[in-house]
């Protein structure tokens, strides 16, 4: 009986460990988008560039430029991977970017675009929107 209990315990612990590893790597595209949006609202150009694929970097910097005259913050950010298209992970976020100018807030709904995230050099990078 003791041996059986030990085998069951080891099996459960092993299963939980494997689940943690799989879910951690599955969240990498989501984390990439969350980090990208954080860099965007903090106006961190260098970080935004490193979180963008080469093909998307110019677009990311244009988006950053559009926020230069306003104060920005994220509100209620929650992202999840909604699927994939070949090697591209699709990530949808809920929440808003709030842009403030002269004490007036403008809310930009994040759920209107789906982020395309690809793996380059072992890193997940934002590489477009739909």
Model-predicted regions and their roles:
Residues 36, 47-48, 117:
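Hydrophobic pocket/interface hotspot
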Residues 26-30:
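Amphipathic alpha-helical repeat elements characteristic of tetratricopeptide repeat
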Residues 86-130:
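Exposed beta-sheet edge and beta->alpha loop/turn motif
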Residues 22-24:
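Bacterial signal peptide processing site
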Residues 17-20:
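C-terminal motif of bacterial Sec signal peptides marking the signal peptidase cleavage site
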Residues 1-8:
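Bacterial N-terminal signal peptides that target proteins for export
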Residues 31, 42-94, 99-101:
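Short solvent-exposed beta->alpha transition segments
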């Amino acid at each position: 009986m003791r041996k059986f209990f030990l085998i069951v315990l080891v099996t459960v612990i092993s299963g939980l460990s494997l689940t943690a590893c799989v879910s951690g790597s599955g969240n990498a595209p989501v984390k990439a988008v969350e980090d990208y949006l954080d860099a965007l609202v903090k106006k961190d150009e260098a970080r935004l560039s490193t979180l963008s694929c080469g093909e998307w970097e110019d677009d990311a910097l244009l988006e950053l430029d559009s926020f230069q005259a306003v104060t920005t913050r994220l509100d209620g950010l929650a992202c999840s991977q909604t699927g994939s298209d070949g090697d591209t992970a699709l990530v949808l976020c809920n929440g808003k970017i709030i842009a403030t100018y002269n004490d007036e807030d403008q809310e930009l709904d994040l759920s209107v675009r789906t982020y395309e995230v690809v793996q380059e050099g072992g890193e997940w990078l934002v590489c477009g929107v739909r």
